[in-house]
Amino acid sequence: YQAAFDNKGMYTGEVSNNLFGVQHQYSKNGKDADKIGWLFDYGKKESVEKNLYQAIIKEGKGYEEVNDLRFQLILLTMLKQKAGNEAFTHLYREYRKLANQEGFDANKYPLPDLMNRYYGETSGYDFTPVLQKWKLYTDRIQAEINRSKGYKATASLADIVSESQLSNARKLVDKDILINSNFEMVDNQQIAPLGLKGSVKIQLNIDDINQLKGQDLLLKEGSKVVKRIAITGKELTVQDVPNGVYTIEIPTGREARYSVDKHYLYIKEKENHLTLKIERIQHSDLVNSSFQFLGLGDDPFAELRTNLNQQQAVFHITSKNPHTYYANKKYAGIQVFDENKKVIFDKEIEGTNVPTGQKDIPLKEAYTIKIFHAETGNRLKSDDSNLINTKSNENTFVVTKYGLENTSLKNNAEDDLLKKIDQAAERILANKEILESAVSEMKDQLWVAIQSLSNNNREIYLEKYQSIFK
């Protein structure tokens, strides 16, 4: 029952196995399991709930940051409960199919994305806002697929009802939910009878507001549009929005393609604020790469992601003890050089006692990245399967407009991009809702990627995928 997706994209080591225990206890004992089970510390539910609320809501911690197995189990229990047991079964069933494919690499299937896909397919709910609230990385493509299919956004009760109203909200919804918590997952209609409403000020951070002016920003519940907000400037104010979580749809720029950093709006019964970072797409997501650093037991301990559109890379260390056999010895490292070969980032990672955290690193065309891993052969992974020289502990990459080129493998970055374009196009063509949508970041990213190609390739690929852009 502990599948290979454990600890992929989120810590589940002593959490996922207990999901089965929770299901057994509550199916056998009903709500009395609060008093006899480990989930709420054998009857100390009030104290557990208070501490979890303090950590998540008041201190703003994410899933990993709470660093408490019980808290993490409660959150995953609430997610599973909203999706339903059939969705949990569907997740395992579909994962077995993936795992039996030739060349299967478990590191390419993080658990947050698996849950977002398979829980959504079964339940019709979009769990992207929940996972993002927990500060877990989620695949933008899967999130867009969820929205395109009209899945309803869902949220923890505590995220859409203020503390002073939680008691009333719990009285309303608890009777219909087996395992109760301030973090039980609900949709907007479940709390609508409370009659709670709030206002929101939306700030649009965009280089040219005229690209959007005169069009509408939409607030949606699944596929249903509940509010149309005329875009008159960079600051929008909306009154009397019922409490809940809403999917946001931003129109396409008139003359340029844009990406949006947030697609969900949370409303509580107060004045709410949301800033949307709307960036012109000059470099497609398809030119980006990610590297996963694995340690003892093949457990991930760090990740590097490039983002040429934002001219940066993000290096995230998630485990303080990558490999105990390498205590006081260099186990991994990253160096980044600018176009003049000046070192602008240098990080060495030993096997133990490593400070965790995230670092943003400047990154532009003509920069160089050097990655060291003492066990590159089987413990340095990439979403680009042919990008790593597994025979060398050090790999050097040059940043080009098409992506990364490994100086020892001599890969052609434009050829690599063509393959990514084909894969992205196939994914769009396989999703009728996205193919027919007038607003799609997947299509915008594909368009920009094709436009960046050399002249001959650009003409070939525009014709090849003209049906996507008609």
Task: Briefly describe each language-model feature range.
Residues H273-Q310, S319-N321, V399-A438:
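Compositionally biased low-complexity segments at domain edges in trafficked proteins
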